[in-house]
């Protein structure tokens, strides 16, 4: 008999029911639970998958370059980036009728195409690419790199090339190599690319494979570097009249600190960014030499964490919190490591979302409004998923990897011991935020509905306005720090030399960009709604992780594993109590809820800025009907009009996705609000009917159909809810923005 799926578990492969498929999917990536796995083998498998992961990323980037070079309009777009729509790729669809072909022949193409809202055109243009040939070369290079990484992944699974467990657990050498090699050297290489290729291209000087060794990036060459006279590289910067991509108004500086934006492209100065990457490289290369490896010099992380002395003063550890035993706990738990890495990456990604629109790095991207909206939403959503993943893996750590003996008295032990205080405080703050914010919104809603809008409770966000004023925003007249020319912030070195401050102040006060947008009562309310979402999601995540080992109701929870369906009614109801259901299922709902509020706010606020009509947001965001009517309903009008009696338009694909997204989302509820007996009856009824229907009964199940467990039903529901939610909002966001701004 042929071996059945899954090969990694003999027990599961022999299960005669459809449970086999479900459990195999559920445990496919849980290498720890597979047959015959050893710790060393586990690390080696994960290590090899990293190469595969990088190969997929290179392949994806290669496909973008290839399709734009083949079917896009990169060379035409460069000539007029503000008015020509960038093309992602052609559409080949045999179902298209004449009206659809006409509607989707856009962006200057004479055949149906998709418009690109990813910002790749702006990125490639900024970093010095100018021709389709450049794109093809990049695509082939990445393809070869992907092949190389796939080979490397395979190679590291061969017996002679498998790293040992001790190699995986040497934290200091890994940290040194990642800091100095991965971050430091790659930042240095990127600074090199910007200085040698991108900056000359922005000044109309083409640097290619033929002349890059003979074209000096700076007229003085390396002399100022060797002489220690580095200021020379900042002299003669591009002027405010510089036309990007030409020599008109161009300077010769390569490393500057101009601050603010290039007036024409409305993006950060390339020379500022080169300076930034060089500085990052220096810092990280130094950081990559701090930890003790072969030579017995440098820091030992274990010694630092176990230390009880801080410059001669007796202490429990950093911030007086004891860290004894943390090194081994962290170094021996892949889930602990993954949890912290996901949390760090999730935070970084959210910061990327916030900075990409407020400090746009790519030329002309600030004026491609649909791309700005798509990139913000995309990065915030991914950040949300990563953060929830962080707490899910924290839950697995507490159940599988945490050793109470080894961590006695340290910070993990302390957090676990006073988890009731942490959870109850989060609960209190969530309740406070929820009731007060909703109370204000509902009050305002009622008085507006009764025709007395002057009775609204409108609160100015004075503390946030103070922070904006401290950064130099003059509008509020607060006269503090950078908005006060006599303050120490204004006059301190190096500002007194007027290095970056004039351009920064001009940018923050311009009113046409997204830097420190003017805020009022509507922002105050939605800020607190977002705070409610953040605190509630955090409450669920933290409770799910800290309660993973046990609670008053179920003190032996850890013995059941990370995910268990139910422990029966005998304990007073233990359904929905595993860390899996709390830190993953429930948290995802609140995470999506929160992201809805965040992206609605960002989008509506920016529609006003882009259309030059901020009054609509300011006046109508202070009550609920304003959000429903003037943001959601008003902006979905064009979307609902994607199909009409007059035929198709270029929003019709988004209109269809909008409808389909709602359908998928609503399907989720069927799986979420249900119980197991219902599914078992349904399955058996379907099988009975199937087996008695001509033709259909020629196909038989090999596995006996068994209903989904409650947890599996929820997973199906959650998947539909999430996918439908994202599809619906993505279609709404892109179509409503593109419909207004082309």
UniProtKB/Swiss-Prot annotation:
Coarsely, its chief localization is membrane
Name this polypeptide is given: Photosystem I P700 chlorophyll a apoprotein A2 2
Instruction: Indicate the secretion signal residues.
Output: none
Q: Which organism is it from?
A: Trichormus variabilis (strain ATCC 29413 / PCC 7937) (Anabaena variabilis)
Provide the gene name from the record: psaB2
Query: Per the record, what is one GO cellular component?
Result: plasma membrane-derived thylakoid membrane
Instruction: Tell me the InterPro entries matching this sequence.
Output: PSI_PsaA/B, PSI_PsaA/B_CS, PSI_PsaA/B_sf, PSI_PsaB
Extract one GO molecular function annotation from the record.
magnesium ion binding
UniProt binding sites for chlorophyll a B3: 670, 678
Q: Which family does it belong to?
A: Belongs to the PsaA/PsaB family.
- Subunit structure of this chain's protein: The PsaA/B heterodimer binds the P700 chlorophyll special pair and subsequent electron acceptors. PSI consists of a core antenna complex that captures photons, and an electron transfer chain that converts photonic excitation into a charge separation. The cyanobacterial PSI reaction center is composed of one copy each of PsaA,B,C,D,E,F,I,J,K,L,M and X, and forms trimeric complexes.
Catalyzed chemical reaction(s)? reduced [plastocyanin] + hnu + oxidized [2Fe-2S]-[ferredoxin] = oxidized [plastocyanin] + reduced [2Fe-2S]-[ferredoxin]
EC nos: 1.97.1.12
Top-rank taxon, per record: Bacteria
């Amino acid at each position: 008999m042929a071996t059945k799926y899954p090969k990694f578990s003999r027990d599961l492969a022999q299960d005669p029911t459809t449970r086999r498929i479900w459990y195999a999917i559920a445990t496919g990536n849980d290498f720890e639970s597979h047959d015959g796995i050893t710790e060393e083998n586990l690390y080696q498998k994960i290590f090899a998958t990293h190469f595969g992961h990088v190969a997929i990323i290179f392949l994806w980037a290669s496909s973008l370059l290839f399709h734009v070079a083949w079917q896009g309009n990169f060379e035409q777009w460069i000539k007029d980036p503000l008015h020509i729509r960038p093309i992602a790729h052609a559409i080949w669809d045999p179902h298209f009728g004449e009206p659809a072909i006409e509607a989707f022949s856009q962006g200057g193409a004479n055949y149906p195409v998709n418009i690109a809202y990813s910002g790749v055109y702006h990125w490639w243009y900024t970093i010095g690419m100018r021709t389709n040939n450049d794109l093809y070369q990049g695509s082939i290079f990445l393809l070869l790199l992907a092949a190389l990484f796939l080979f490397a992944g395979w190679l590291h699974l061969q017996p002679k090339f498998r790293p040992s467990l001790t190699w995986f657990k040497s934290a200091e050498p890994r940290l040194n190599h990642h800091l100095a090699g991965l971050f430091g050297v790659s930042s240095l290489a990127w600074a090199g690319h910007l200085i040698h290729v991108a900056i000359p291209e922005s000044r109309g000087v083409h640097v290619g494979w033929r002349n890059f060794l003979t074209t000096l990036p700076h007229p003085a060459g390396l002399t100022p570097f060797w002489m220690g006279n580095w200021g020379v590289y900042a002299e003669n910067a591009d002027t405010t009249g510089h036309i990007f991509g030409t020599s008109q108004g161009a300077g010769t500086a390569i490393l500057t600190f101009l601050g603010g934006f290039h007036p024409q492209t409305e993006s950060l100065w390339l020379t500022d960014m080169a300076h930034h990457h060089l500085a990052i490289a220096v810092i990280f290369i130094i950081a990559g030499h701090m930890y003790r490896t072969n030579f017995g010099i440098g820091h030992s992380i274990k010694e630092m964490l176990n230390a009880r002395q801080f410059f001669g003063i007796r202490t429990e550890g950093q911030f007086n919190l004891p860290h004894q035993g943390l090194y081994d706990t962290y170094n021996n738990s892949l889930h602990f490591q993954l949890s912290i890495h996901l949390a760090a990456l999730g935070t970084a990604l959210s910061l990327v979302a916030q900075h990409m629109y407020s400090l746009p790095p790519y030329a002309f991207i600030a004026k491609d409004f649909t791309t700005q909206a798509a990139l913000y939403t995309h990065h915030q959503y991914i950040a949300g998923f990563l953060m929830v993943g962080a707490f899910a893996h924290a839950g697995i750590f507490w159940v599988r990897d945490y050793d109470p003996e080894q961590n006695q008295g340290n910070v993990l032990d302390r957090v676990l011991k006073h988890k009731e205080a942490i959870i109850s405080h989060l609960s209190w703050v969530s309740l406070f935020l929820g009731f007060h914010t909703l109370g204000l919104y509902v009050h305002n809603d009622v008085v507006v509905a009764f025709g007395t809008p002057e009775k609204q409770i409108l609160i100015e966000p004075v503390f946030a306005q103070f922070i904006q004023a401290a950064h130099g925003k003059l509008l509020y007249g607060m006269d503090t720090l950078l908005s006060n020319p006599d303050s120490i912030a204004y006059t301190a070195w190096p500002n007194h030399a007027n290095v970056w401050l004039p351009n920064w102040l001009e940018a923050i006060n311009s009113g046409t960009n997204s830097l420190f947008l003017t805020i009022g009562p509507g922002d105050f309310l939605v800020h607190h709604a977002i705070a409610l979402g953040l605190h509630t999601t955090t409450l669920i995540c933290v409770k799910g992780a800290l309660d993973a080992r046990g609670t008053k109701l179920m003190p032996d929870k850890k013995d059941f594993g990370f995910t268990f369906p139910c422990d029966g009614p005998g304990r007073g109801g233990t359904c929905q109590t595993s860390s899996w259901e709390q830190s993953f299922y429930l948290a995802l709902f609140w995470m999506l809820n929160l992201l809805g509020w965040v992206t609605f706010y960002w989008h509506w606020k920016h529609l006003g800025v882009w259309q030059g009509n901020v009054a609509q947001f300011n006046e109508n965001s202070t009550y609920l009907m304003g959000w429903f009517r003037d943001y959601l309903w008003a902006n979905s009008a064009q979307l609902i009009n994607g199909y009409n009696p007059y035929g198709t338009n270029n929003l019709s694909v988004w209109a269809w996705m909008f409808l389909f997204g709602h359908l998928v989302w609503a399907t989720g509820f069927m799986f979420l609000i249900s119980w197991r007996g219902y599914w078992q009856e349904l399955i058996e009824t379907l099988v009975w009917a199937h087996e008695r229907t001509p033709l259909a009964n020629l196909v038989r199940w090999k596995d006996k159909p068994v209903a989904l467990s409650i947890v599996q039903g929820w997973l199906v529901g959650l998947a539909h809810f999430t996918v439908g939610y994202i599809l619906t909002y993505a279609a709404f966001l892109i179509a409503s923005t593109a419909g207004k701004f082309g």
